[in-house]
């Protein structure tokens, strides 16, 4: 009975204190960072408020008591618990403080671990006509374990629970919950319950450890830089005063060495007849270029300072970069000319160009047109080089009479004709010669192959003669045949011997047939020594009277005929006519 009475006394004390105490305004604080409340887009609403029962004080809360949206319904019957969003870096300490205007006399802290909660925000949630701020979690946010008790807060006169919770606030008699060296496993919902229900809800998100601070990186080392800021046009009337000194902005960078500087003002007349007056910036940095010394329209353009008049100068011999922008007035300098023109006349109207040098190099420049209303022209700043005047040679200096080098007039080198293909070098000559030789070899080889192929084709092609049918046929090979030596009149090689050859009479009478010529060669002798008689051609049938010679049909073999060996060898070695 004693434990039961003790528990009953605890519950009665909690209920009495809760009814007599107003709901406090809750806050959350983290160490080292403050509480962050971030609005979120629409997401699924989970109100994780629960009602604490008798069994909740004995140990872990039942996870089934968490009902989505049920806490909002309870919020319409009583004051909703404040909701807080706390972001903590990994490894940091944080403290959840539930104190407000009214102290919480007794309560218990619970923890619900969740994962995947990327979109979390504190948003106004309305149920019917009642609205209250509540935590809004994304759909990907899911609990990993049931909600469990992690600490309690009771007055000193109330006996404590026998079981020590896993995490106990060091301030046992105040509604604080402190977590040391937070890890990602500490991400979740922390709720403070009292006898009437949830009193405060905290969502703690433990993120990655912030990167260690890096050593500050200074600007890259650079040389001094200057920039002139002035008016590009000034209108005046005769008798007025105008100042040519612009504002010079200086950035000395990391330089610690003294430097020299000059400020030069150049004057050029700007005729009113020029609709546009051009100032070419490349010529400020390269005043000796041929294009700058001999521009196309020198009267309406400012190109090289060598073509203008130097009207004023400031020369600084040694100046410290530690002075910053004050070096123009703090450093000693030598000057001549007038920077401020008082009681100006109309003759002083024109273009004034300021060129500033730093250690002998052009650092910045600026221009201003000082003119009356009648002589005002439009000035245009060009970023390209001007066009070269016709007849200007392409050699150094750009002039055919004299050039300027560091203020000294020297004769110009002789002009050379312009070669659009560049200067001829031995390498180019070698390439041209090699190309010509290769082309000659290719053409000669092609011609030789054509001649060779044509000769081979002519040698292998048989000779054909046309016929009356319009076709072509192989031409017969005619040669003399051996006959009786009585018909021999001379050598075959003698052209006149052909006329003396005898022809046998036609067996057909006047049929027009003319037999073949008989051979009169001495070599055509009868091969047989037994028969010394004359060879008589056998009678043949009459033939046509055409003048075209046809190849005779094969003769029957004659036993004692002439020797055709010489004739056969001649036919085999004969070439087509």
Curated annotation (Swiss-Prot):
Family annotation (Gene3D superfamilies): Immunoglobulins
Localisation per UniProt entry: Virion membrane; Host cell membrane; Host cell junction; Host Golgi apparatus membrane
Under the heading InterPro entries, the entry gives: Herpes_glycopE_Fc, Ig-like_dom_sf, Ig-like_fold
Q: Which sites carry carbohydrate?
A: 87, 93, 185, 258, 343
Protein topology in the membrane: Single-pass type I membrane protein; Single-pass membrane protein
Signal sequence coordinates:
1-20
Give the Virion surface membrane side ranges.
Answer: 21-428
**Residue runs in coiled coils:** none
A Gene Ontology cellular-component term = host cell Golgi membrane
Q: Which residues lie on this side of the membrane: Intravirion?
A: 450-577
Acidic residues: bias regions:
488-497, 521-533
Q: Where are the stretches annotated Interaction with gI?
A: 117-141
Subunit info here reads: Interacts with gI.
What is the protein name given in its UniProt record?
Answer: Envelope glycoprotein E
Q: Give the species this sequence originates from.
A: Suid herpesvirus 1 (strain Rice)
Supply the gene name: gE
